[in-house]
Amino acid sequence: MIRNNNMEELALVYNMFQRRQASFELLRKHLAEFIVAEGSKLVSEEVKNDDLVVKMIDLRERVSGIQSKAMEKDAHIDMTIKMAFEKVVNVDNRTAKALVFYLDEMLKKDFKNINEAELTERLDKVIHIFRYLTDKDVFEGFYVNSFAKRLLEQRQICEDAETALVLKLKEECGCQFTQRLEVMFKDMKMSDELCQEFKSSPTSQGLEIDFSVKVITQGQWPNDKKETQFFQQIP
């Protein structure tokens, strides 16, 4: 019934099983086993990172639909769903990496034709999966690198979308979690302002190059030791 998504039959089963503790626990057990089985297949299969996230979101929406439509938004069922997903996504760091990759691909796209409501909906779906990660610092480490690359490349960056995601992460994990991201944002804005001031100054007149610099706060940006050593070897 769960696999077939038969809401009527699931509602009947829920109404019968919820009356007895042992039966209700059996229902929760079967639901958890279904989520773990389906989710584990996604994590273990050789699927692309963005496909993994899309399918994980679909799985969550599917079981959440069962909980809300067939099981009267039962809080115990909600806890069962949460614990099952936590078991799936915390086996290793694959899901954390996949979320960062998915967000990177999404945020690189042009958001001019997407309204605020649609942007919020898409980000919220990702945040739902993010909540299941127990070690969110792993996600933060991957995300900082991805975020820094997007800022430095400045290719098709949608500032509104980037800001919206940082705010959502801040709501979920607090100010300390997003401190580096906010500092990096400020660094880029300050760098852009300084470059514009220089280009408008008499000093820049007659230059045959497009002069641009990035001023970054020490200790806040990712530090690639290999890259640093490479540049130190240049005479």
Residue ranges, per PLM feature:
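Eukaryotic scaffold/interaction segments
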Residues: 1-235
